[in-house]
A protein has these predicted regions:
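Metal-dependent phosphoesterase core characteristic of DEDDh/y 3'-5' exonuclease domains
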Residues: 1-20, 42-162
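Acidic catalytic cores of enzymes that act on phosphate-bearing nucleotides/polynucleotides
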Residues: 161-170
Length: 170
């Protein structure tokens, strides 16, 4: 958990959506301390593959906060080993290239467009964790990623290969 800067007021909409306790906003660790912890975690696990739903959002968020807090001078640490897989893009690829989905159900909008957001896809597939909070989102992604591996192991394997620039060049 991370406390907010005392100079900022929380958005009432964000408080409602995220259901984040006010106590955590005032008493948890500072943003800088959290970003140092995140940097050390990624440094320790630098060879691991990062799987994130909407990875560009997460990367931009981390990059921006690394810069703002000066927690590390390695602002691009997620991208050094070319090991980021965006499960949102992977899910779109599975939807596009797999003729018939048998394991994963994709919800549609009111206008019959497929919706690939983590919360909606998770609910459609019977995965229920607290959304918009780290632990719940990680558990949802873990379960959804398992469904993707069952649905299209060849596409998931290709995503892992393409995440590595050396493999992608072949």
């Amino acid at each position: 958990h991370c406390r907010m800067d005392k100079s900022r007021l929380p958005s009432p909409i964000a408080l409602t959506i995220n259901q984040y306790p006010i106590q955590n906003l005032t008493q948890s660790q500072s943003l800088r301390d959290m970003m140092v912890e995140i940097s050390l975690f990624f440094e320790k696990h630098s060879s691991a593959t990062i799987i994130a739903h909407n990875a560009s959002f997460d990367f931009n968020f981390a990059h921006s906060h690394y810069f703002q807090t000066l927690a590390t001078d390695d602002w691009y640490q997620w991208k050094h080993n070319n090991n980021v897989i965006c499960s949102l893009e992977l899910l779109r690829a599975i939807y596009l290239f797999k003729e018939k989905l048998t394991t994963i159900e994709i919800p549609n909008s009111r206008f019959a467009y497929p919706q690939f957001g983590l919360e909606g896809v998770s609910k459609k597939n019977g995965i229920f964790y607290q959304s918009h909070e780290a632990e719940g989102d990680v558990k949802s992604l873990r379960d959804l990623y398992g469904l993707m591996m069952n649905e299209a192991p060849d596409i998931v394997s290709l995503a892992h290969s393409c995440a590595n620039k050396q493999e992608a060049k072949r």
